[in-house]
């Protein structure tokens, strides 16, 4: 099942990821919470936006279909995307979803904030602050989006809870072309079920546990889920343990480990590893490979992504004045 020519299409929810990095040399007197003096702010595309950037890294033709709000965060996001991928914009109700991590080094760089931490050379995640609640409207798709989905060589649905995966016309088009266009579905715990005929669904471990009522093993539950969804295969990503693949047609379940020689050093930033996995699988399926081959390549690709520094390669960094960062944590204020 493959479509010759055409772009690789990523359809989903594009987010703006932000890192505030600095030092935590002291704590708050009132609560012993770490006080982070921010040195710089880093922006990068997240969600479907990151997936599209990853897919385009080797020069392939990639089209991103996603919703964009009329706000400063969306403008920043478009600036990170437009030079690298073709973007087809869908109307978004509400504001851009931003996920902001506060990270630090220093003696008080610890998420619990109650004791001095053993200092690490790597930034320690102190907290994450989410903002924005934009959702894609169920308006008719622009003609450009319909044309792109019709001519795609493969589709990756990157569901991050923003409504793209639930859009009725998108789902109808994906179902109509599923027999000759491989579709990889990266699900969200609160998102819709994959469309019937999807070639591969790639939940992470936590999402799989939610779908399977807290149980994930080599038993029949995963196969029953694949049958219920009418998808060709499910691959549960397991981090450094690789992936668990289940094929609907045969009921075969296969654990695909990460080779020890490919294991990334401990402490690497895993943000975006799941997107890397899904992209690699979609590219492999577009080449006409089967799901087992696609998942084996995806396991390696995710490890290589983390080992190479993760999503940092797709970021833009700017310095931040300490007074500004401590006075107001607005992620877009410059």
Description of each model-found segment:
Residues 1-4:
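A short acidic-Thr-Gly-centered motif at the start of a beta-strand
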Residues 6-8, 16-156, 313-334:
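Conserved N-terminal subdomain of the carbohydrate kinase-like
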Residues 8-10, 183, 201, 234:
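Residue-level marker for buried hydrophobic side chains located in beta-strands
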Residues 12, 65-69, 187, 238:
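Short beta-strand/turn micro-motifs composed of small residues
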Residues 24-35, 98-139, 149, 153-224, ...:
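Conserved beta-alpha-beta core of the PfkB/ribokinase-like small-molecule kinase fold
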Residues 132-136, 151, 168-182, 188-197, ...:
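Conserved phosphate-binding/catalytic region of the ribokinase-like
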């Amino acid at each position: 099942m493959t479509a010759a020519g055409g772009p690789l299409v990523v359809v989903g929810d594009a987010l703006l990821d932000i890192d505030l990095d600095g030092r935590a040399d002291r704590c708050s007197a009132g609560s012993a919470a770490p006080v982070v003096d921010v040195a710089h702010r880093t922006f990068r595309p997240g969600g479907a936006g990151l997936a599209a950037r990853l897919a385009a890294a080797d020069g392939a033709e990639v089209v991103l279909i996603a919703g964009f709000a009329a706000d400063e965060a969306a403008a920043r996001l478009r600036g990170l995307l437009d030079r690298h991928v073709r973007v087809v914009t869908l109307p978004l109700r509400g504001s851009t979803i931003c996920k902001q991590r506060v990270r630090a080094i220093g003696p008080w760089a610890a998420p619990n904030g109650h004791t001095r931490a053993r200092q690490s050379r790597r930034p320690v995640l102190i907290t994450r602050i989410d903002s924005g609640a934009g959702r894609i409207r169920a308006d008719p798709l622009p003609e450009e989006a319909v044309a792109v989905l019709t001519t795609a060589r493969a589709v990756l649905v990157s569901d991050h809870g923003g409504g793209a995966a639930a859009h009725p016309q998108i789902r109808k088009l994906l179902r109509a072309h599923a027999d000759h266009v491989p579709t990889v579905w990266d699900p969200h715990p609160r998102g819709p079920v994959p469309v019937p005929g999807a070639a591969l669904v790639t939940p992470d471990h936590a999402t799989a546990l939610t779908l399977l009522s807290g149980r994930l093993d080599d038993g029949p539950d995963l196969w029953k889920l694949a049958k219920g969804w009418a998808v060709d295969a499910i691959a549960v990503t397991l981090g450094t343990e690789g992936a668990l693949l289940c094929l609907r047609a045969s009921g075969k379940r296969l654990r695909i480990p990460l080779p020890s020689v490919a294991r990334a050093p401990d402490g690497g930033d895993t943000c975006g590893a799941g997107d890397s996995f899904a992209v690699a699988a979609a590219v492999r399926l577009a080449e006409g490979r089967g799901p087992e081959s696609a998942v084996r390549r995806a396991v390696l690709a995710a490890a290589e992504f983390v080992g190479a520094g993760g999503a940092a390669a797709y970021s833009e960094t700017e310095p931040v004045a300490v007074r500004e960062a401590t006075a107001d944590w607005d992620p877009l204020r410059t």
